[in-house]
UniProtKB/Swiss-Prot annotation:
Gene designation: rnc2
Family the UniProt entry places it in: Belongs to the ribonuclease III family.
GO CC field: cytoplasm
Catalytic activity: Endonucleolytic cleavage to 5'-phosphomonoester
A GO molecular function held by the record: rRNA binding
Subunit annotation: Homodimer.
Entry protein name: Ribonuclease 3 2
Keyword entries, A-Z: Cytoplasm, Endonuclease, Hydrolase, Magnesium, Metal-binding, mRNA processing, Nuclease, RNA-binding, rRNA processing, rRNA-binding, tRNA processing
Active site annotation, chain numbering: D55, E126
NCBIfam families listed in its UniProt record: RNaseIII
Record flagged with keyword tRNA processing: yes
SMART domains xref list: DSRM, RIBOc
Amino acid sequence: MTLVYPRRQRQLESLVRKLGLPITAPIKWELLDLALTHPTVSESANYEQLEFVGDAVVRLAAAVMLWETYPDCPVGDFAAIRSVLVSDRILAQLAREYGLELHLLVAGSATSDKIGQESRLADAFEAVLGALYLSTSNLELIRPWLDHHFRQLAAEIRLDPARLNYKAALQEWTQAQFKVLPEYRVVEINQANRTQERFAAEVWLHGNKLGEGKGRSIKAAEQAAAKVAFLAITPPEEIANQ
């Protein structure tokens, strides 16, 4: 099914070609059009519902790729790597790579909001994934072009363990379980020698200390504490199902 407006149809076909997909693919064009319509354009016909679906789809796509590529990787690392892959920063980066901003319908009031641009692009990217998934009820229109991005990023993250985002993984778990965020308490323990572990961090939830760690920076110490906590409180099967 094509759209009523030939110009919009051509725009969407251009995007599909950038994704490396044939325009004869079983795409529901009306959904793809909706995925690229910001709420400022229409309060009812916009990408918000597709973004909700796409949020789950991108996490599934990342999880499957990681499982296939790194079958021996600890499941806790899977969650930490995936938290980076599905972050707004990465999704907005991919959206720019495919020129989504050229096809995203946004009212003038939002176009001047430069601060919110990254969030808009990430949301639209998720919505596009949602539209493609709902077109076939599987990942066949997504994995052929998304896998190699995620695979390359995952390899870079594994080479630099500091990029593993256990803080995000822990936050995701606590929000899902308790609807609250963990609390981090950081103290400076080694001011004299800044080349060594300078900060100690503790992570707390509901009055209970979940983990502690040290690092050369506050961020590194918090990540170390989050890793201890996350791996201690989340069974492997629960991490896999997040």
